[in-house]
Amino acid sequence: MSKDKALDIVLSEFIELAKVPRPSHHEERVSKYLFEWAERHGLAVERDSLNDIIIDKPASPGCENVPRVIFQAHMDMVCVSEEGVDYDPVNDPIKVINDGVTLTADGTSLGADDGIGVAMCLYLLQDDTLRHGPIRAIFTTNEEDGMDSLNLDPRYLDGGVILKSEQSFHLSFSSAFS
């Protein structure tokens, strides 16, 4: 798949995600959205008691013995608005403005932290042109002010490599097992 096509898919997934309100402590709808997304794509999916979503994609043929790679992104966002903007973060979607170069929001925060991480994971889960070992995407809740998902069941962390990125050009590598 070309870089342009991949970028189009990531941006499309992000813009769709922005339609789902997702402030911290109110992730039920976005959790449901991601669960249903996985089902539509024929992927194994689980939801835990905190509404964290765990999606598994099997390995490409011939790559079954490659260690699982786990990608993690949080689904909640900081919700702020400019003074005078009528915005209810629990119920209102983000109005994304795409000028062809930059994505911004109409008077509110955009939710790129970590909505773009979620969108990138969704792209990886749906791209069937990549050869890969087993992939797991973990979408966690309440990262912005509580880090509730630190209590994630350790059985979900059985990967050879865990990839998480919060900043451009900075990638965290870790493993549940040394």
Q: What are the residue ranges of the model-derived segments?
A:
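Acidic/His- and Gly-rich active-site-bordering loop/insert found
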Residues: 2-101
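A glycine-rich helix N-cap at a beta->alpha junction
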Residues: 152-175
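Active-site metal-coordination/substrate-binding segment of hydrolases
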Residues: 63-134, 139, 144-145, 151-160
